[in-house]
UniProtKB/Swiss-Prot annotation:
Biological processes, Gene Ontology terms: tRNA methylation; tRNA wobble uridine modification
Keywords for this protein: Cytoplasm, FAD, Flavoprotein, NAD, tRNA processing
A Pfam family hit: GIDA_C_1st
GO terms of molecular function: flavin adenine dinucleotide binding
Family named by the database record: Belongs to the MnmG family.
NCBIfam families in UniProt: mnmG_gidA
InterPro entries in UniProt: FAD/NAD-bd_sf, GIDA_C_N, MnmG, MnmG-rel, MnmG-rel_CS, MnmG_C, MnmG_C_subdom, MnmG_C_subdom_sf
PANTHER family: GLUCOSE INHIBITED DIVISION PROTEIN A, PROTEIN MTO1 HOMOLOG, MITOCHONDRIAL
UniProt: NAD(+) binding residues: 271-285
Name of protein: tRNA uridine 5-carboxymethylaminomethyl modification enzyme MnmG
Gene (name only): mnmG
Cofactor(s) needed for function: FAD
Annotated organism of origin: Bacteroides fragilis (strain YCH46)
Main localisation: cytoplasm
Length: 625
């Protein structure tokens, strides 16, 4: 065999799969190294994809030509749109997936991508010559040669699991950790630290009293993750269930805190703020009498259930005893206990926006090794790292996404500019341009860029063009079509909105909250005929996109103006221009932070914590602005 590659990806989690697929689809000879081919894209925790802001990231991955959205649609067993009561900037898709089918769907994709080879092994060392990565060595004593390497090792780097006082080395339950690799990277001056995450018990569904729980059903409308997928749901759609903890369960948990690794000093690492363990919840919120739990199926052919909201590293017997105090779990049987895991991560401020290391040329980092948490955040980083690894091999301009282009852009900019002191999770609140970053228009924002890059093929690009044309036709029709008051007022009263005193444009009516494109079209024959011209299977998607553009035109325009103004600061390049230690007009903190991050632009400098507006003014003056 030939062990020489353009790009090697270490780790086949969600970041690694997207990175390897992107590099190979762009034409790089690529190798994906994983410990276990039967665990590619394993959902290590919750068997679900998407959620608030995370769903938008998956849509963006899909718009760029990635696969997470397609695999999710193919293996979803429940689909919902979250935040429907809010505006479209806040809508987020989420799906429960069949855990095992998700793995096999991804594996089928990977095994059929030209230029992509999978190797089952464990990497122990990267090879660096003259400040540039050139290869790696594995525990099978195989030496690989590579022009670029992407590290996507997840929680496996020196992973250590905790259940009560029991500690067990590993990257996941019953899977070995990866040793020596962190140290082989750190010896080249790259800083690293430790983080912690956790997962709940897995329950035997035959022991659950479902009649004592509330049901949570999915939705069966046109929404999906992939812009390519117009088919109905592939798998049988299943229910989830909800219930609450109670004071009896809390007392059991409190009595066990002395044996909790989180509270007895056994775990020193920082865990995810927005996904706390059940023991953290009862300590942080002592007055709260109950906490909601979600019981979620792991697949359509298994009894295994995931208990969302009950992550724990308490001793197994305490976890079981506490759960048995909840009526629905009074006869509880589990497949395995919850556990916590500590792992190594690398400070992401040591990376460029391409996710390439600033210290080792052609070495890229993506996913949980950068201090993030979540499959979606990992996948978003993975596709960007894979694209740029290919570009480093074959030439071209670096591919980055701005904060007004994508949640992926917000994510990466936050990582490389601000760094992390706890596992980073994406929220809509982290994006200052979230009206521009809606779930409905990820294809409009990103697919053309990916097409020019060569990652998006003709079929996807043709779908984008036809959708864009249809949406523009609808919006233009409503702008130009006039309606007389006498002909529409009866309809307006039927729709529960105020009659007109004089004629107006159709777009003005659609801007009313009671009016939608579909309900007003029933009373405007010319508009109905215009909509009937749309024979595309994606008609509902097209109508939704057009309606959002109409109803939120003012907000979108205002945010676009703000983004464009700030974009001017993005054009002022400062990397390598200043000796920050010598700039006494800057604050001490600003000098330290600017020296460490070495920002590319004035705009990036302005987002560094500790760099004040007055510091930015100093840099602008020194830049001749």
């Amino acid at each position: 065999m030939d062990f020489k590659y353009d790009v090697i990806v270490i780790g086949a989690g969600h970041a690694g799969c997207e990175a390897a697929a992107a590099a190979a689809n762009l034409g790089s000879k690529t190798c994906l190294i994983t410990m276990d081919m039967n665990k590619v894209a394993q959902m290590s925790c919750n068997p679900a994809v998407g959620g608030i802001a995370k769903g938008q990231i998956v849509r963006e991955i899909d718009a760029l030509g990635g696969y997470m959205g397609l695999v999710t649609d193919q293996t979803a067993i429940q689909f919902r749109i979250l935040n429907r009561s809010k505006g479209p900037a806040m809508w987020s898709p989420r799906a429960q997936c069949d855990r095992n089918k998700f793995i096999w769907a991804w594996r089928e994709i990977l095994e059929n991508i030209p230029n992509l080879h999978i190797w089952q092994d464990t990497v122990k060392e990267i090879i660096v010559e003259n400040g540039e990565v050139v290869g790696l060595k594995t525990f099978w004593d195989v030496t690989f040669h590579a022009r670029c390497i992407v590290l996507t090792a997840g929680t496996f780097l020196n992973g250590l699991m905790h259940v009560g006082k029991t500690q067990l080395p590993g990257g996941r339950m019953a899977e070995p950790a990866s040793y020596k690799l962190t140290e082989s990277i750190a010896k080249h001056g790259i800083e690293y630290g430790r983080m912690k995450t956790g997962t709940p018990v897995r329950i035997d569904g035959r022991s659950v009293h479902y009649e004592l729980m509330d049901t949570q059903d999915g939705e069966c409308d046109f929404h999906k993750f992939s812009f390519m997928n117009t088919s109905v749901r592939h798998l049988k759609q299943l229910q989830c269930w909800t219930c609450f903890t109670n004071e009896e369960a809390h007392n059991v948990l409190r009595n066990g805190l002395a044996d909790s690794p989180l509270f007895n000093g056994q775990i020193q690492s920082i865990g995810p703020r927005y996904c706390p363990s059940i023991e953290t919840k009862i300590v942080t919120f002592p007055d709260k009498e109950q906490h909601q739990l979600f019981l979620e199926p792991e697949g359509e052919t298994t009894q295994e259930l995931y208990l969302n909201g009950f992550s724990s590293s308490l001793p197994m017997e305490i976890q079981i005893e506490a759960l048995k105090k909840i009526p629905a779990f009074k006869d509880l049987v589990i497949y395995r206990p919850g556990y916590a895991i500590e792992y190594d991560y690398f400070d992401p401020t040591q990376l460029k926006h391409t996710l390439e290391s600033k210290k080792i040329k052609n070495l890229f980092f993506a996913g949980q090794v950068n201090g993030t948490t979540g499959y979606e955040e990992a996948g978003g980083q993975g596709i960007i790292a894979g694209i740029n690894a290919h570009i480093n091999c074959h030439g071209g301009e670096p591919f980055t996404l701005a904060r007004d282009e994508a949640y992926i852009g917000v994510l990466i900019d936050d990582l490389v500019t601000k760094g992390v002191d706890e596992p980073y999770r994406m929220f809509t609140s982290r994006a200052e341009y979230r009206i521009l970053l809606r779930m409905d228009d990820a294809d409009m924002r990103l697919t053309e860029r990916a097409y020019k890059l060569g990652l998006v093929k003709e079929d996807r690009y043709a779908l984008l063009k036809s959708k864009r044309e249809a949406v523009e036709n609808i919006v233009n029709f409503t702008r130009n079509y006039s309606i007389k008051a006498a002909l529409i007022n009866d309809a307006l009263e039927n729709l529960g909105t105020t009659p007109l005193r004089q004629g107006c444009k159709l777009i003005d009516l659609i801007n009313r909250p009671q009016i939608t494109i579909e309900n007003i079209s029933e009373y405007v024959p010319a508009f109905k005929r215009e909509l009937d011209k749309i024979t595309d299977e994606r008609k509902e998607e097209i109508l939704e996109a057009a309606e959002i553009l109409i109803k939120y035109e003012g907000y979108i325009g205002r945010e676009r103006i703000i983004a464009d103004k700030l974009a001017r600061l993005e054009s002022i390049k400062i990397k390598g221009k200043f000796d920050y230690d010598s700039l006494q007009s800057l604050s001490t903190e600003a000098r330290q932070k600017l020296k460490k991050i070495d920002p590319e632009t004035i705009a990036q400098a302005s987002r560094i914590p500790g760099v004040s507006p007055s510091d930015i003014n100093v840099l602008l003056v020194l830049s001749g602005r």
